[in-house]
Regions:
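Conserved N-terminal segment of class I S-adenosyl-L-methionine
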Residues: 1-102, 112, 122-125, 129, ...
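Conserved acidic residues
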Residues: 43, 107, 132
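Conserved beta-strand signature within the Rossmann-like core of class I S-adenosyl-L-methionine
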Residues: 132-141
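A short SAM/SAH-binding and catalytic strip from SAM-dependent methyltransferases
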Residues: 108-119
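C-terminal alpha-helical "lid/dimerization" subdomain adjacent to the S-adenosyl-L-methionine
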Residues: 140-151
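Short glycine-rich, flexible loops that bind phosphorylated cofactors or substrates
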Residues: 117-118, 123, 143
Length: 192
């Protein structure tokens, strides 16, 4: 198990995230996450841990125009803004009280490959507005920047039960490496 890393850690690996959306190794995750979003495009999609904006590009191509990307990595945000000039991106940390207060006015959240990186994942999720629609993804494999990983999709539900409502949830398992048995779990849910 790894440790929670500062923004600079992610900045040093930005090159591997500069691949165009169409060739991204996370493309399947992005496509499933977009499919699991609420059908209405009236609400702003808040993408926490937006990285280089590849998911934002998919949303734009699908007709979404209300989007806010948040990341604490300056390098990732610079690329996200360059890649998606029509969307808004801000620098922020999930532990920043001003960011948490700002998020209270939104109702649709996406956290792709975020929760495994933060120590206080439950506290952060608990701070989001009740009744919000959410799409989350987490891996079943370890990394030096992962503070946790989940061996099975049921472990995800067990960890966040009580904070997130998974009733009626669609659960998607994406195999990222057959040889290594790596998977990413994508789930839609509601904040309790």
């Amino acid at each position: 198990m790894g440790t929670e890393m500062p923004a600079e850690f992610y900045d040093q690996f930005i090159d591997r995230h500069l691949i165009p959306f169409e060739k991204s190794p996370w493309r399947k995750v992005y496509e499933e996450a977009a499919r699991l979003l609420p059908e209405s495009k009236d609400e702003t999609i808040v993408d926490i841990g937006c990285g280089t904006g590849r998911f934002a590009k998919l949303l734009y191509d699908k007709g979404y125009r209300k989007y806010l990307g948040i990341d604490f990595s300056k390098g990732m945000l610079e690329e996200a803004k360059r890649y998606n000039p029509s969307f808004t991106f801000i620098e922020g940390n999930v532990y920043d009280e001003a960011i948490v207060r700002m998020l209270q006015k939104y109702h649709v959240f996406v956290l792709l490959e975020v929760l495994e990186h933060i120590e206080k994942d439950k506290a952060f999720l608990s701070s989001l507005p009740q009744g919000s629609d959410m799409v989350i993804s987490v891996p079943n494999y370890d990394s030096r920047a992962h503070v946790r990983h989940f061996k099975h999709i049921d472990e995800v539900i067990e960890r966040y039960d009580g904070i997130l409502d998974f009733q009626g949830t669609e659960k998607v398992v994406i195999k990222t490496s057959e040889r290594l048995k790596n998977e990413i779990y994508v789930l839609n849910c509601k904040k309790r």
